Design a protein with these regions (language model features):
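Short Pro-Cys-Gly-centered "Cys-loop" motif that presents a nucleophilic cysteine in a tight turn
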Residues: 1-137
Length: 137
C-alpha cells in the first residue's frame, strides 16, 4: 500500500476538502481504478452513502456540505466528480513531496507570525558555507 517515504504536510483548514478530494481521486489519477467509488483504499464509497464504516468520523468541513446526510453525500459526489484543476493537484503533490505547508497567504501570516523563516522552502541538506574571502569580487 505504501510506496516510498512517509510524507506529510501542514494544510490550511479551509483546504481540507480539496486535499480529501485529492486522496479520493488518487487511485483514478494513477490508473489503479477507473472510478473513485471502485477503490477499497479511500472513503469515497462511505461518503456517498454506498458503504457504512462506523469507525470513520467525518471532518467538520464535510458536515458543512449540507444539513442532511443525503445532501452531504450528493454535494461530495459532485465535488469529487468535477475533479480538481491541474494546478491544484500540482500544488498538493509539491507540498507533499517537499513537506511544504499548503496554506493561504492569510493563514501563513497568522501561522508563521513569530517564525517567518519556517514559511520559506529550503533546499535539502546543510546551507552552503559562505567564505568572506571568496565573496569579494
Amino acid at each position: 500500500i505504501w510506496e516510498g517515504r512517509y510524507r506529510s504536510s501542514l494544510i490550511d483548514p479551509d483546504y481540507f476538502l480539496r486535499c480529501q478530494r485529492y486522496i479520493e481521486l488518487n487511485p483514478v489519477r494513477t490508473g489503479y481504478e477507473s472510478s473513485p467509488q471502485d477503490s477499497a483504499w479511500t472513503s469515497f464509497a462511505t461518503h456517498i452513502g454506498e458503504n457504512a464504516e462506523p469507525w470513520l468520523v467525518d471532518h467538520q468541513h464535510f458536515w458543512r456540505l449540507g444539513n442532511t446526510p443525503f445532501e452531504r453525500q450528493m454535494k461530495w459526489a459532485d465535488f469529487v466528480k468535477e475533479g480538481a484543476p491541474h494546478w491544484e493537484d500540482r500544488q498538493i503533490t509539491e507540498s507533499l513531496i517537499r513537506s511544504k505547508p499548503w496554506v493561504s497567504d492569510i493563514y501563513a501570516k497568522k501561522l508563521f507570525k513569530n517564525a517567518p523563516e519556517f514559511a520559506q522552502i529550503r533546499h535539502r541538506g546543510r546551507p552552503k558555507k559562505i567564505n568572506p574571502l571568496n565573496s569579494v569580487g
